[in-house]
Amino acid sequence: QRWPSPK
């Protein structure tokens, strides 16, 4: 599973 970067 992947999620949007914290940038």
From Swiss-Prot:
UniProt-recorded Gene Ontology molecular function terms: peptidase inhibitor activity; toxin activity
Chief location of this protein within or outside the cell: secreted
PTM-bearing positions, type Pyrrolidone carboxylic acid: 1
Tissues expressing the protein: Expressed by the venom gland.
A Gene Ontology cellular-component term: extracellular region
Coiled-coil features, chain-numbered ranges: none
Secreted found in the keyword field: yes
Keywords: Hypotensive agent, Metalloenzyme inhibitor, Metalloprotease inhibitor, Protease inhibitor, Pyrrolidone carboxylic acid, Secreted, Toxin
GO BP annotations, alphabetical order: regulation of blood pressure
Localization, UniProt: Secreted
Top-level taxon in the UniProt lineage: Eukaryota
Biological role stated in the UniProt entry: This peptide both inhibits the activity of the angiotensin-converting enzyme (ACE) and enhances the action of bradykinin by inhibiting the peptidases that inactivate it. It acts as an indirect hypotensive agent.
Family recorded in the similarity comment: Belongs to the bradykinin-potentiating peptide family.
Protein name: Bradykinin-potentiating peptide 7c
Source organism per UniProt: Bothrops fonsecai
